[in-house]
Design a protein with these regions (language model features):
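Beta/alpha (TIM)-barrel catalytic core signal, keyed to glycine-rich beta->alpha loops juxtaposed to Asp/Glu
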Residues: 1-123
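Conserved small/polar residues in nucleotide/adenosyl-binding loops
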Residues: 124-130
């Protein structure tokens, strides 16, 4: 048994009550939209709208993270990725993968390069800084 809900660095609502139930009932989360419609790849930074991107094609349907707070969080997460020399998308996916209540992370690659980047997350190791 599992639950399929959205979960990402920008959408952590699952952690409020549901994560505890997942662990207790051994019913893991299948996290979808782990890259928050592409916002956690960095492709929409500074107002950019790449050709054939979801935001370019479907615009108003995916504005959930285009808020002031959403954009601020995206920039802060991007800074963290850069500081630690991490690929932004991979850091975002790994965050989901490392949660004890997550069974699997559902990816949605459009290109072969995106698929390779996403698969490489399985072989990526994050360590906590020692300071």
């Amino acid at each position: 048994m599992s639950v399929q809900n959205p979960y990402s660095l920008l959408n952590r609502t699952y952690e409020i009550g549901l994560a505890e139930v997942s662990i207790r009932e051994e019913s893991g989360l299948l996290a979808y939209s782990p890259l928050a419609f592409g916002y956690l790849t960095g492709k929409y930074r500074n107002g950019e709208l790449p050709k054939n991107s979801r935001m370019k094609l479907f615009g108003d349907q995916f504005l959930r993270y285009k808020t002031k707070n959403g954009q601020l969080a995206i920039e802060k997460y991007h800074e963290i990725a850069n500081k630690h020399e991490l690929n932004f998308a991979q850091m975002s996916l790994k965050f989901c993968e490392l949660q004890p209540f997550v069974t699997s992370v559902i990816i949605g690659a459009t290109t072969m390069d995106q698929l390779k980047t996403d698969i490489a997350v399985s072989y990526t190791h994050l360590t906590l800084p020692t300071t």
